[in-house]
Structure formats: structure tokens, C-alpha cells
Amino acid sequence: MEAYLVEMYHGVPYTAAVQLNLVEKHSANISLTVWIPMFQTSLPKNSVMDLLHDVTVICTQISTVHGPMIKVDLSSSNAGLATMPRQFLINAIIALDDWGNMDYEVPVAFDKKSFCVTILKPKNMLYTVPSITPTNRPTHELIAVCSFHNRVTLKSFNIPVFIRALYIRQQGLDSVEQAISSDVDHAITTARVAPYAGLTLVINITSTKGAFKLLKAGSQILAELGPYLTQVSLHDVIMNWKHTGTSYILKSSSTSG
């Protein structure tokens, strides 16, 4: 079983974001990507990795008003992971591989093929993009374009990420654009793609100027990128993707006017 650790924070307590790649225990006809709701812990990181090896996984596909969902039940004989959620729902369309097919209301036992633990800051220092306080009458959108380089294939690529909506008066537009091309360059110091909910972009913030004034200095922004692990392996994302820089776009909002 492959196990990976992505460290974006080195203190305690910390938030653990765990993603499991699963295969059906008895026939290997079904594979799933499952992400455990984030939980906060002060356990040594290596202990969390060791304890996850012994977790057993049962998944059941169910029908809900929100569409097909996977009910995940985790169990462990060790009490060390007391803060880890043991039962939760995830979107079946994202979790199931294209070739996988689960019957409804039939519990299925799974083996762990690989897993990844991403270490993030405490929960009060984490922001997901949808949770950032909305702006009244937004006129513009702040987009972060994070550049990455694959050290094996030597290919470079950009990932654009919506950060937040802004209200900017026309007479102040020039000064805001100048800030985005200068000051904000120092606000985002590092970015990394981590396997969670498919893939998640983790951005570290060190400044609260301008567009980032609603965020705490030292916080982390999490932006979900979607279920791309069918095309990209855990090993490739963690070992070979290197963040090379971030640029910013101020886009006129479609709701402005």
C-alpha cells in the first residue's frame, strides 16, 4: 500500500485532510476515491499514518435528494483517531471511477490501495473559497493563476482559481490593478496541489492587504479543483508537481453593471 504525506504546516494542533484510494476487497471490480471530512488532531503525523493502515472501510451507494451518494463507514480497533469522522457521505459521481459500478443499498468491503494525508493549519486558519465572505454588488473577480511544472514530463501548466469577488469603484480600478501586480504578489507565498476531494489547491496567505483584507494573515485558502485523479496518479501529484509562481487576474464580474 502506498502512503503519502503532504506537509503544509508544521505545528500542533493541525488539520488532517485524508484521501483514500480504494479497491473492492474480493473482486477488485470497483475502485473508489474517498476523502474523509477534515479533522483536527495533535497526534504525531507518523502515528496518524500508521493508524490509517489499520482502518477498515465499508461503502454503500445510496439514493438521496442530492443524487447518488456513497455512505462510508470507517472502523478501527485503535482509539488514537478519536477525532476522525467514522461515518459520512460523499458524492458518488466524483468518488466512483468511470469503470466502477456499485449496486444500490449493498454494503461493499474495500481495501486501501493508497492514501494521502495532507497536514494543514488549524481549522480557524483555513478558508474554503465558497466560505469567504461575499461582497455586496461585486464588480470584479480576483483570479489566482498558479503555475506548475512536472519534473518528469517537463511540461508546464497553469491552474486558474477563483479567490473572491470584489467591489471596486471605477475611479479606483487603476490603483487596485497596480496592487494586484505588486503587493498581492507577496500575499501568496506558496501553493501546492494536494489529493483531497479529487485535487485541492492549498494557498498560503501572509498579507491581508487589498483583496485579502477579509482573511487572517498566515491563513490557508483551499480551492477544490475537482476529480482529476482518474487522469493523474497520487505519486505524480505529490512527487513531481512543483509550484513555480502565481499571477493574478482582475476580471470584470458578469453581475456588475
Swiss-Prot record:
Membrane topology designation: Peripheral membrane protein
Organism, as annotated: Murine pneumonia virus (strain 15)
Protein name: Matrix protein
Organism lineage string: Viruses, Riboviria, Orthornavirae, Negarnaviricota, Haploviricotina
Keyword Electron transport: no
Gene name per UniProt: M
Molecular-function GO terms, alphabetical: structural constituent of virion
Family, similarity comment: Belongs to the pneumovirinae M protein family.
InterPro entries from the UniProt entry: Matrix_Pneumo_C, MATRX_N_pneumovirus, Pneu_matrix_N
GO cellular component: host cell cytoplasm; host cell nucleus; host cell plasma membrane; membrane; viral envelope
Subunit structure, interactors included: Forms dimers. Forms higher-order oligomers. Interacts with glycoprotein G (via N-terminus). Interacts with protein M2-1; this interaction directs the matrix protein localization to cytoplasmic inclusions comprising viral proteins L, N, P, and M2-1 and mediates the matrix protein association with the nucleocapsid.
